């Protein structure tokens, strides 16, 4: 090319192309804010009171177990009663199938007792008692709930686990009841404004 080097092999066009891809070539990333222990405390106050329903206690228990055990939704909803073992100061969860478990061997997750209102072990015991799930049961822990008009109570229904979409909806509704937006940071500002109510 007339004695000149090829301009396409220069670093400048590669950097320009990469910069263009970074600014306009990719979809906007909607980064979510993490759930904090303070948010969990407010969830427990709202959903985990002594007179709460089975539906509210399920919501609280799902949030606490998934937070304390670093569980994904799929791992949480596939927990069975036989996968839980209570000990004096902790409980162990056996995760049968996980996204990161390449050989499908399963793994155990230990969750410690705390003396706080956000104790996942105590909340799980309360949930199991209220749901009438016996220790020898092999049923899913989190199942759909039906409302009984005659007795004015909630009861677990069926033998199938809670669908992923419903579990996600329960969590988002619980966060929404605290004033948190389901999208990005605008909910955090709203949460800070209404925090004094709880």
Where are these regions (language model features)?
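Extended, non-catalytic subsegments within catalytic or DNA/protein-binding/adaptor domains
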Residues: 1-198
């Amino acid at each position: 090319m007339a004695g000149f080097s090829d301009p396409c092999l220069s670093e400048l066009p590669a950097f320009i192309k990469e910069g263009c891809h970074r600014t306009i070539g990719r979809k906007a990333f909607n980064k979510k804010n993490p759930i904090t222990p303070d948010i969990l405390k407010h969830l427990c106050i709202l959903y985990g009171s002594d007179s709460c329903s089975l539906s509210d206690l399920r919501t609280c228990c799902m949030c606490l177990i998934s937070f304390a055990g670093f569980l994904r939704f799929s791992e949480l909803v596939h927990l069975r009663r036989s996968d839980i073992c209570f000990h004096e100061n902790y409980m162990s969860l056996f995760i049968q199938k996980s996204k990161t478990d390449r050989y499908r061997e399963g793994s155990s997750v230990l969750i410690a007792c705390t003396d706080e209102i956000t104790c996942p072990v105590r909340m799980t015991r309360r949930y199991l008692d209220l749901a009438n799930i016996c220790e020898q049961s092999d049923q899913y822990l989190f199942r759909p709930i039906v409302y009984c008009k005659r007795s004015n109570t909630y009861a677990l229904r069926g033998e199938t686990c809670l669908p992923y979409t419903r579990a996600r909806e329960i969590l988002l509704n619980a966060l929404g009841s605290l004033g948190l937006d389901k999208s990005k940071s605008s909910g955090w500002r709203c949460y800070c404004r209404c925090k004094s109510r709880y």
